[in-house]
Every structure is written in C-alpha cells, then in structure tokens.
Amino acid sequence: MSKDTGLRAITDHVQDLWQLANFSFHTPRSLTKFRQIKSVARNSGAQCFIESGTYKGHTTKRCAPEFQRIVTIEIDEKLAQNAKQFLCNNLNIEVLQGDVIDCLPNILDRDDIQNVLVYLDGHFSGGITGKGEIDEPACDAINILTKYADKLSAFIVDDFREFGKPGFPKKSHLIDACEDFFGDHTKLTVHLDQVIVLRMNV
C-alpha cells in the first residue's frame, strides 16, 4: 500500500470520527471498516478470514497481520488479477476469482478452514465493481453459511443502508437470515452500516 493511499485512509478515518461526533455519520470509509473487522476478529477469536468482494485488495491487505489465513473472492476477472499482484507478498492471502455463491462451499469444505470470520461485501455498486447473477447475494451466501455454522466464529454484512433498494433484499429479510444463525448463542448488532453476527461463548 502506497504512502499516499495510507495517508488518504487515515484522513478518511478522521472524517468518519468527526461525523460520528457530530451525529452526521452516513457511510464508513475503508479504514473504519477495517477497524471494525479487527474488533470483531478479536472478540470472536477468529483465525481465518473469508472476504467476498476483494475489489482493489486494500481491506484484504490491512487484515493480513490479523489472521493466520485469508481467502478473498472477487467475481471480476481483471480486479481479481490486479488484486493477486497487489497481494502477492502476503503469503497468508489467497485470491480466488469467481462468484461467492460458488466459491464459499469449496472453501468451507476444506479441513484446514476453521474459526472463520466471513465478510460479505461482494455486491454490485456500479463503476468497475463486478456483478454476478444478482446485485446483492448476501442472503444467498448466508443460506450457504448455515451449513457450515460450526466452522464460523462470526460474519459481517457490509453496506446495510443499501438493503431495500432496487436489486437488494429488504433489510428485514437480511435480519431474519441473521438473527438466529447461531441459535441461542447468536449476538446480532447493526453498527457503522454493518450487520455483525457473533457466536457468543457458552
């Protein structure tokens, strides 16, 4: 990550903090999202990070020191190739090109994938972002995750504000898919435009 990119991320994070302090917060920026991922990882004990929506790989790279293993999924072929080059020096990161709906089962079937934090940020948002069969596959991805709940420590769904817009599931549908994910041990929070689902310790 370049010095200019890092400085811009810090500046954006300061703006987020200022907006929070003035009750005018709307959309968290990259570094703010990373700090939340880091907090969830530490609270849940997650050692493996699965991300859908690699984009340019900046969040992935920031997460590299926080997890033993990272698998990130990008549907757009060019973005995935660029991310592989950007992240090539991070030996604990694997970049996969494909649809999260197809990739998730293959990843979670691996015996060495345990104590996982899944970060669902793989939706079409215009510009160069990739698009699958549906604009926002989060609810479909969560249905897949239910089959592997014993491997998960937590998951996060990003951009909660977008749900209910054309092409996106309703907010209520997303919450319904999340609220009993870990049965009686589910802790669900909506914070900084993200839905966070944690497995509570027994």
Cite the ranges covered by each PLM segment.
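A short alpha-helical cap/connector motif
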Residues: M1-L117, H123-V202
